[in-house]
Amino acid sequence: MKLTLHEARVIGCLLEKEVTTPEQYPLSLNSLTLACNQKSSREPVLSMTETETQMAVDSLMKRRQVTDQSGFGSRVVKYKHRFCNTEFSDLQLSPAQYALVCLLLLRGPQTPGELRTRSNRLHHFEDVAAVERTLLTLAQADPAIVHQLAREPGRRDSCYEELISEQSKGVSAPILKQSAPAQQSDNSPHTSDEMEKLSARVTLLEKEVVMLKEALHELLN
């Protein structure tokens, strides 16, 4: 089952804050909501209420993706992810993979160049090639975690997206490819007429060739 938009945002924020602000991690409901609604480094920008954040957290807790933690003597409940890299997680990611998955959850489809530029606080990539190699390992995972999208007109590089949330477009690619046969079927009468005309023309040309051969034979004899 894929993550909803709100669930994906919660997981992405917990992944991000665990690395960028470890002193504030785990996050309270208020801090998590603020992180989800950041206007920078988020796409799309959301306006989640604490109730909506709590609903996403509750759903993730039922799926064992998030757990709550409260300090001794503290009345504030805080949350941390169990999405990856814990003893309870099936998914184990390298620091490079972790950074890219986090960015894709928070900002949607991005090119390798964009991912390298935006990953500085999470992980240092030597160059774009290093990003591409990491993306390849994620794409070849079983099941695949990321997917390369077709290059958009006017863009030099293709974007990659995560396949963890419902926002991913990877599932729509086969549907787009299937539209080609339908278009061909719509044009089939026109194609059939052209084939008939072409066949008649070939037959006529063949007759003319036979006549020319006969005329040439008479001249030579």
Curated annotation (Swiss-Prot):
Q: Which domain of life is it from?
A: Bacteria
Fetch the InterPro entries from UniProt: DUF480, WH-like_DNA-bd_sf, WH_DNA-bd_sf
Segments of this protein annotated with the region Disordered: 174-197
Biased composition regions of type Polar residues, renumbered to the chain: 180-190
Q: Name one Pfam family in it.
A: DUF480
HAMAP family given in the database record: UPF0502
PANTHER family found in the cross-reference section: UPF0502 PROTEIN YCEH
Its family remark reads: Belongs to the UPF0502 family.
**UniProt protein name:** UPF0502 protein Ssed_2611
Organism lineage string: Bacteria, Pseudomonadati, Pseudomonadota, Gammaproteobacteria, Alteromonadales
